[in-house]
C-alpha cells in the first residue's frame, strides 16, 4: 500500500527521501558493475511487472486497499539493487501519472517498497537456501 501525501509529516518524507538518495546511487553503481549490458533491459521489464502488479488493488477492511509488488521476485531474478531501481521507477510513474502514493511521500514509499521489500525478501531467501529450507531446494 502506498503512503499517501499528507499522511507523514514533510520532515519525515524529506528524511526518507534523503535516506534513499545514497541507496539509489549505490544501486546504480552496483548494477553497472554486476549486470551485463544485455540484462539491463530486464530491469525495465521488472519495473513494468511491478507497475502492473501495483495497479491491481484489492479492498481490505477499514476502507483501504492492498496490492502485490513483486519486489522479492525481481530481486531473486536480477538482484536486490536492480529491484530497488526498477520498483523506484514504477513508483515514480505511479505517483506522477496516477497519483498513487504521492510526490511528497515518494521517498517514504521507495524506502518501504523499493528498498526494504526486495532486500529483506532476497536475504531471507539466501538464509533459507543456506540452511536448506528454501522451497526451491531439493535433494538430488
PLM region spans:
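Hydrophobic, aromatic-rich alpha-helical transmembrane segments
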Residues: 6-10, 14, 31-40, 80, ...
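Hydrophobic transmembrane alpha-helices
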Residues: 2-15, 20-73
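Short helix-perturbing small/polar motifs within transmembrane alpha-helices
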Residues: 113-140
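Membrane-water interface at transmembrane helix exits
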Residues: 28-32, 58, 94, 98, ...
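Alpha-helical transmembrane segments and their lipid-water interface positions
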Residues: 18-23, 86, 116, 120-121, ...
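Alpha-helical membrane segments and adjacent membrane-interface helices in multi-pass membrane proteins
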Residues: 54-117
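Structural motif
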Residues: 46, 82-84, 121
